[in-house]
Amino acid sequence: GASGLMASIASALAGADTIILEHMDRVGKKILATGNGKCNYTNEVQGLSCYRGENPAFAVPVFRQFDQKKTVAFFREIGIEPKIKNGYYYPASEQAASVLDVLRMEAAYTGVKEIVSCEIKAIKRQGDFFLIRTGTGDFRAKSIIFATGLFASPKSGSDGSALPYIEHFGHHIIDIVPAL
């Protein structure tokens, strides 16, 4: 989804060799379903009341660093002009595919590699690295970003299959509800 693509772009821009391991046949399928296929990529209102969980204030530092204005500026920079309706920002094309396409192009431009139809079999810590075993080969990484969508949209790949790996590395999981 958008979070995984944005994280991969940020990782590559920070100088890391970055690979997306995607178990679906295409990266970013969930984006196509957002905003009824129009992809509202940000909102004018982003207060604490918009967030769920045990600690909604956890989001505050993130939005101080990359707020709504920076989000709009980022998307403009990569080719998405906004169309604003009722406080929601959509691409001017009103097509979610536009957002997916420019995110994938920006990821490729920054050096991100995509490996699709890649099922993760195991992730193990080996010293300073992680060994990621997949159906298409093994990968070593200093860091892993889990951007799985969990149960948001099983048809687009967000099916919860990464949850055991996330829990294995000590992350506390709160009650999960599907959401785009």
Predicted regions and their residues:
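Glycine-rich active-site loop/strand segments that organize a redox cofactor
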Residues: N36-N86
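An accessory alpha-helical subdomain
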Residues: D67-R76, N86-T110
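Glycine-rich FAD pyrophosphate-binding loop
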Residues: A12-N36
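N-terminal Rossmann-fold NAD(P) dinucleotide-binding loop
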Residues: G4-L5
